[in-house]
């Protein structure tokens, strides 16, 4: 017969765990909205900056211009910037990014190209350190809401590696935030810089609302803005080369900040979803244990009655 006290203790333990997961879900839900707003507010500036650079490059296409950040050279070594979180309990968020990074590392190895890792986030740092991977730099204890200073610090390290020709290309591996239920690890080339713009056609503006004690999501599709082209007769006060040279580091740092923000929003959304699932599983387990407890208690009462009746008959 099951031990009633052990079942009661187990039910209480699961209830305590559910309180923790529910609290973590509420905290993540409060933060994910702010992170999502930052992501969507950053993208228009990043896209406009990319359009400016694209137009300037087009204006200088037939000029003899030497800009180090745009220089294409034979690729012998690639720096991989891998962005994960510092903490767990966020479903497959960290695992998916690390798995994508390992796939890219294997692809480079098959092509005979060396690689170095620059990791942002404790989970990636711990994982690759245990496997003795070549780590050129690591950045941990980043803010949950990334800042421009953090992006600038990482950007300075990447610029140093690229301009010193320690690496010939810099690739970014991060989780692109689309919505609460959609986030995908992607690879983007950071250096040499390209101005391809940002894909926003799948984005959603959403708000969290509560209904019967549960979160519901109201979604609205985000419309992409058409690209703007400078008129050919536009006159620049400064030399376009000087403008381009000044904007390139800003563009790099902006791309990094956007990636960090999208990764942070993806992590918070994944944590909210994981804690919501954990709370639901805890509720189901409490129900199962309660039924087991009631059956065991009923069996114990029945057994006692049988013993009383048997004792009375014996007299």
Curated annotation (Swiss-Prot):
<dbReference type="InterPro" id="IPR000131">
    <property type="entry name" value="ATP_synth_F1_gsu"/>
</dbReference>
<keyword id="KW-0406">Ion transport</keyword>
<comment type="subunit">
    <text>F-type ATPases have 2 components, CF(1) - the catalytic core - and CF(0) - the membrane proton channel. CF(1) has five subunits: alpha(3), beta(3), gamma(1), delta(1), epsilon(1). CF(0) has three main subunits: a, b and c.</text>
</comment>
<dbReference type="GO" id="GO:0046933">
    <property type="term" value="F:proton-transporting ATP synthase activity, rotational mechanism"/>
</dbReference>
<comment type="function">
    <text>Produces ATP from ADP in the presence of a proton gradient across the membrane. The gamma chain is believed to be important in regulating ATPase activity and the flow of protons through the CF(0) complex.</text>
</comment>
<dbReference type="InterPro" id="IPR035968">
    <property type="entry name" value="ATP_synth_F1_ATPase_gsu"/>
</dbReference>
<keyword id="KW-0472">Membrane</keyword>
<dbReference type="InterPro" id="IPR023632">
    <property type="entry name" value="ATP_synth_F1_gsu_CS"/>
</dbReference>
<keyword id="KW-0139">CF(1)</keyword>
<keyword id="KW-0375">Hydrogen ion transport</keyword>
<dbReference type="GO" id="GO:0031676">
    <property type="term" value="C:plasma membrane-derived thylakoid membrane"/>
</dbReference>
<protein>
    <recommendedName>
        <fullName>ATP synthase gamma chain</fullName>
    </recommendedName>
</protein>
<dbReference type="GO" id="GO:0005524">
    <property type="term" value="F:ATP binding"/>
</dbReference>
<dbReference type="GO" id="GO:0045259">
    <property type="term" value="C:proton-transporting ATP synthase complex"/>
</dbReference>
<dbReference type="Pfam" id="PF00231">
    <property type="entry name" value="ATP-synt"/>
</dbReference>
<keyword id="KW-0813">Transport</keyword>
<keyword id="KW-0793">Thylakoid</keyword>
<keyword id="KW-0066">ATP synthesis</keyword>
<comment type="similarity">
    <text>Belongs to the ATPase gamma chain family.</text>
</comment>
């Amino acid at each position: 017969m099951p031990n009633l006290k052990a079942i009661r203790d187990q039910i209480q333990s699961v209830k305590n765990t559910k309180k923790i997961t529910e609290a973590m879900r509420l905290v993540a839900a409060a933060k994910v909205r702010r992170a999502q707003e930052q992501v969507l507010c950053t993208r228009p500036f990043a896209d406009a900056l990319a359009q400016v650079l694209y137009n300037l490059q087009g204006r200088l296409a037939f000029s003899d211009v030497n800009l180090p950040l745009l220089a294409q050279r034979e690729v012998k070594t690639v720096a991989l910037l891998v962005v994960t979180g510092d903490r767990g309990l966020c479903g497959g968020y960290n695992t998916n990014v690390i798995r994508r990074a390992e796939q890219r590392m294997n692809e480079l190895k098959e092509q005979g190209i060396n690689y170095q890792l620059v990791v942002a986030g404790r989970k990636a740092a711990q994982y690759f350190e245990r496997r003795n991977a070549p780590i050129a730099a690591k950045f941990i204890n980043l803010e949950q809401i990334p800042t421009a200073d953090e992006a600038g610090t990482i950007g300075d390290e990447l610029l140093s590696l690229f301009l010193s020709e320690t690496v010939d290309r810099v690739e970014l591996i991060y989780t692109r935030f689309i919505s609460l239920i959609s986030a995908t690890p992607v690879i983007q080339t950071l250096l040499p810089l390209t101005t391809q713009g940002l894909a926003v056609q799948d984005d959603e503006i959403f708000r969290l609302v509560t209904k019967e004690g549960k979160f519901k999501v109201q979604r609205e599709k985000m419309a992409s803005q058409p690209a703007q082209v400078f008129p050919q007769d536009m006159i620049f006060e400064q030399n376009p080369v000087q403008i381009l040279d000044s904007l390139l580091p800003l563009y790099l740092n902006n791309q990094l900040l956007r990636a960090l923000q999208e990764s942070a929003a993806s992590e918070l959304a994944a944590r909210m979803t994981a804690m919501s699932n954990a709370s639901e599983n805890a509720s189901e387990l409490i129900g199962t244990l309660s039924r087991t407890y009631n059956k065991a208690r009923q069996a114990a009462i029945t057994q006692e009655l049988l013993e009383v009746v048997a004792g009375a008959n014996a007299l």
